[in-house]
Amino acid sequence: MIDWIMDTSKGEEAEWQSVNHATVNSIGLETDLQLTIHRSKFKVSYSYIHQDKEQEVGIVSQYALEYLRHKLVVSAHLPLIKHLSLGLDYRWQDRVGSYTDFEGSVNHYKPYMVTDARLTWQQTKWKAYIEANNLFDVSYRDYGLVEQPGRWMIAGCSLRIP
């Protein structure tokens, strides 16, 4: 597998370089369960990946050794009153690997949980919604050094033109 790696045993001389780094075998599974009760819909999804490549001491990988090992999503779509519905999504993710911060320290990814919610008002020819992502303002890094946004909201509408 071609990857960007850094050999930290070289200390200050360590540089990122693109190399044919490793052979990686992956195995995984993905499953989901859906349930509809009256007009309410519930769904649980889970995926798992295992790679047999062990992380080498002193080698920091940019891509090959970082992957999402566990992902669990629990969703509910609930009608509240006529035309108004609530969608809730809970996501738990556990990523394997590490990233290098601006000071040069190697940090391992931490599992995190995020909850999103969406209120939708739907008519025959139009719908409007307001959505809150990362509802509980969780601080996390999903990939690399990039810190993901805290709580944020969006709103929108759509028209159906015959």
Per-segment meaning from a language model:
Residues 2-3:
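Long, hydrophobic alpha-helical transmembrane bundles and adjoining juxtamembrane helices/loops
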Residues 9-11, 28, 122-123:
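A short alpha-helix capping/helix-coil boundary motif
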Residues 63-162:
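Conserved C-terminal beta-signal and adjacent last beta-strands/turns
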Residues 13-100, 156:
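Gram-negative outer-membrane beta-barrel transporters
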Residues 6-9, 88:
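Conserved small-residue
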